[in-house]
């Protein structure tokens, strides 16, 4: 059973998502939060697997709450950012903060449930279109922030190649076509990249690739 918490300042949104998810046999909504501070508190108390996190909330916004939760060793929840807004303003910062992906608030019940399953399973819900927005935002912010590049040396040539292509916005299927390998092989390579670099998911890997300068906007 996937344990989900919903953090949104609109009661109707929380209720709607609870109804949608409650109809799924493998998902249980264990709690709600009406602002970011409450989200942090309840996440520590309830230990959900996935948190649906609104961005614009009172007291503490969703980005700050995401950052705090991601840094807490006693909370292992994955975070899906809920949005009705254009992502350009905060896609990069949300991913740097520890979000595992984005979900539009008007997503269908099927899309909502599938998004929860994807993130709970350890993957990132990050469409190539969102990756391209991330790249543009990174370019606007001025390039590498110079974290340690030492771990990149642990990657094989093929793993580095896969990381570069993923970071340029290609889907697993597109990477597979470019490298003439199966999609499952690409998934295996991505998994090894995450393990070797000590990263949580695809979203973190893309941010890491740009921050180390492995990939640069416009390459």
Regions from the language model: what does each represent?
Residues 169-204:
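Recognition helix of helix-turn-helix DNA-binding domains
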Residues 57:
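Receiver (REC) domain active-site loop signature in two-component systems and cognate sites
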Residues 91-96, 101, 106-157, 161, ...:
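Short, flexible helix-to-coil linker/hinge segments that flank and couple to helix-turn-helix
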Residues 53-54, 65:
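Active-site T/S-Asp motif of two-component receiver
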Residues 8, 54, 83:
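Active-site residues of response regulator receiver
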Residues 35-38, 60-67:
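Acidic catalytic/metal-coordinating carboxylates
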Residues 46-52:
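Active-site beta3 strand of CheY-like receiver
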Residues 26-34, 42, 199:
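Short hydrophobic/Thr-rich beta-strand motif most characteristic of the beta2 strand and flanking loop
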